[in-house]
Amino acid sequence: GLGNPGPEHAATRHNAGFWFIDELAPRHDGSLKPEHRYHGDAGRVTIAGAALWLLKPMAYMNRSGLSIRSFCNYLQVPSEKVLVVHDELDLPPGIARLKQGGGAGGHNGLKDVISHMGEDFWRLRIGIGHPGSRDDVINYVLERPSAVDERLIREAIELAVAEFPRLVAEGAELMMNRLHARPPAQEAPG
């Protein structure tokens, strides 16, 4: 899961990847601890009978690739077996999408991961919405979402966490069908 370390970043949109890991790990009796050789917090869980490793890089977002590469090298995990969970400006809050491969789409964390791993890894994209102007993106991702947007983001994460055992047991297609069939969430009337 991608995010920025430290309490000052914990509630920001850019930490949606960390939010996912923070929901997934305890649900499967897992916890993360600092692992200096991976430059992050890591832990092992068992999901659908498979042992999986979770990682939250403790470098800033745009330097996450080294942590993930170190982790994969040590565990001998090929890129195509890696899932990177990250915030996605191009999806509205309340939407999560799974895909394999592709470019960075302007996401600096993904750019760094791609520079260390190539493009073949899987991505779970958690929609955070777009501020409307490219000039506002940096401040937007580093701010806490509105209460409505946070609820929608967390609902998308909840659905992805609930469907994750299906990904492990049955493959990506079924999880993709469930996530991608969900219509965009509607904002509550103000």
Regions found by a protein language model. Give the residues of each.
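Nucleotide and nucleotide-moiety/phosphate-recognizing core
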Residues: 1-101, 111-124, 131-136, 151-158, ...
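Short glycine-enriched, charge-decorated loop/helix-capping segments at active-site entrances
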Residues: 97-103, 141-145
